[in-house]
Amino acid sequence: MTTHNSQYSAETTHPDKQESSPAPTAAGTTASNVSTTGNATTPDASIALNADATPVADVPPRLFGSFVEHLGRCVYGGIYEPSHPTADENGFRQDVLDLVKELGVTCVRYPGGNFVSNYNWEDGIGPRENRPMRRDLAWHCTETNEMGIDDFYRWSQKAGTEIMLAVNMGTRGLKAALDELEYVNGAPGTAWADQRVANGIEEPMDIKMWCIGNEMDGPWQVGHMSPEEYAGAVDKVAHAMKLAESGLELVACGSSGAYMPTFGTWEKTVLTKAYENLDFVSCHAYYFDRGHKTRAAASMQDFLASSEDMTKFIATVSDAADQAREANNGTKDIALSFDEWGVWYSDKWNEQEDQWKAEAAQGLHHEPWPKSPHLLEDIYTAADAVVEGSLMITLLKHCDRVRSASRAQLVNVIAPIMAEEHGPAWRQTTFYPFAEAALHARGQAYAPAISSPTIHTEAYGDVPAIDAVVTWDEQARTGLLLAVNRDANTPHTLTIDLSGLPGLPGLGTLALGKAQLLHEDDPYRTNTAEAPEAVTPQPLDIAMNATGTCTATLPAISWISVEFHG
């Protein structure tokens, strides 16, 4: 996660950062020349799967991951609050756990993030009363270490999630990573494994996916490195970890964002050097409406098209990974772990940092090292939810290369779940598109043929208004259509033809299930603690025709999901 020390936040949609030519449109999408000012009830867009449609790939369960960092109130006051009325014997908030399960999260990256780069994992084990307090240099806070890997493992068992564990490559490195691996996954009989048993966890945690550092290209990162420095370091750590335990899946740090001056060359340098020992490379991208304070129309339209940037990001990193494979005469593809993505209004964080600096210059000081302060607690709009739904569509359409993803973060900190101190937990607008995909996108993903009117953006040129993805589980005969209208002004009516799905005997054999629409006439409307259901998906007006096709109208700035079965 990028801090104010970078030129921009970890997102890449600012028009000044674009190349002179428009970004390519999403794969499988063609732009029609239909006017966007026509009659919204007359179909002007179509989604179709032809009989010869081939799947992108199997939908990987890890695509629906999230992220818990020791940052703000994500851990303390989020997943862990011993004094809360719903807290269990471990101090975990049951109301938050219930929402995490409802969200459908499969895998959680922990404990950072920038935090991990000066974190000693040993500080978080053993009796809580013996754990030291430390200064967290990333977020300028005091870390109490009440939560550590043992506690988070217990939480993940209750949440039903896999753990993706990150190791410190900022102030530490090879030995600390090997010690933590032994502690976490070792069978009893060695020093660190026996310490785990003594701390109450008898069986190995069996954590398979490990991130070797976080955003090590960023000058804000404690111990940041050049591409060559990190390439050598990650190669040594990954090699040693795989000697210690076969079957691990190791993630190298990719660029912190597409705005970084070494974007692309960083990935090629790192992956070429450490190709044999790596399985994934990370991708990080955040987006926000840069004109949100004035509600500028052009900025909103650019924001709605953010998935164009994510598509280009995936293509660039995939190309670098392929070049590394060719340089090593290899056969395996390095997969992408998009382990930080979502909407983050980083301008608010930058303003907070500027205020603190100004106060310090005047001799005014806020609490220098606070414990779990309110940080990055963005409240999301209906438009934000549509954009996150659009980004999820993009991840699914590229799941042949993006085999893991973590929507950042999980609770309170730029999160779909908010938890009031000593109060209720509630769903943000962004909760709903993620949950629908996480719970119902199964089987194989398909990028349908899409014909769509175009919209003009300052950042990306002319792009299709409509984007969509289809998933289909042929064995269970269940499927899901996700679609968005990225047009800020005009509704569009879709004709949907899914007759080309494999295993169907013919047209008219599909039955519609639950169909939902997320849209608000005021795209800036939010949920709050006082009105937690102000923005929720509503039933979508859709019907199957005698020909086996469907028609549905998508208002401007909207997301839909349609469950179906054969």
From Swiss-Prot:
Segments of skewed composition (Low complexity): 20-32
Taxonomic path: Bacteria, Bacillati, Actinomycetota, Actinomycetes, Bifidobacteriales
Binding site for alpha-L-arabinofuranose: 69, 114, 214, 286, 340, 409
Biased composition (Polar residues): 1-12
Record key words, sorted: Carbohydrate metabolism, Cytoplasm, Glycosidase, Hydrolase
Thermal activity characteristics from the UniProt entry: Optimum temperature is 45 degrees Celsius. The enzymatic activity decreases significantly at temperatures below 35 degrees Celsius and above 60 degrees Celsius, although considerable levels of activity are still detected at 20 and 70 degrees Celsius.
Family from the record: Belongs to the glycosyl hydrolase 51 family.
Site entry (Important for substrate recognition), positions: 344, 409
Protein name: Intracellular exo-alpha-(1->5)-L-arabinofuranosidase
Function statement: Involved in the degradation of arabinan and is a key enzyme in the complete degradation of the plant cell wall. Catalyzes the cleavage of terminal alpha-(1->5)-arabinofuranosyl bonds in different hemicellulosic homopolysaccharides (branched and debranched arabinans). It is active with sugar beet arabinan and wheat arabinoxylan. It also exhibited activity against alpha-(1->5)-linked arabinobiose, arabinotriose, arabinotetraose, and arabinopentaose.
A biological-process GO annotation: L-arabinose metabolic process
GO molecular function: alpha-L-arabinofuranosidase activity
Subcellular location: Cytoplasm
Pathway: Glycan metabolism; L-arabinan degradation
Catalytic reaction annotation: Hydrolysis of terminal non-reducing alpha-L-arabinofuranoside residues in alpha-L-arabinosides
Highest taxon of source: Bacteria
A GO-annotated cellular component: cytoplasm
Classification via Gene3D superfamilies: Glycosidases, Golgi alpha-mannosidase II
A Pfam family that the UniProt record links to this protein: Alpha-L-AF_C
Subunit structure as annotated in this protein's UniProt entry: Homohexamer; trimer of dimers.
Catalytic residues as annotated in Swiss-Prot or TrEMBL: 215 (proton donor/acceptor), 340 (nucleophile)
EC number: 3.2.1.55
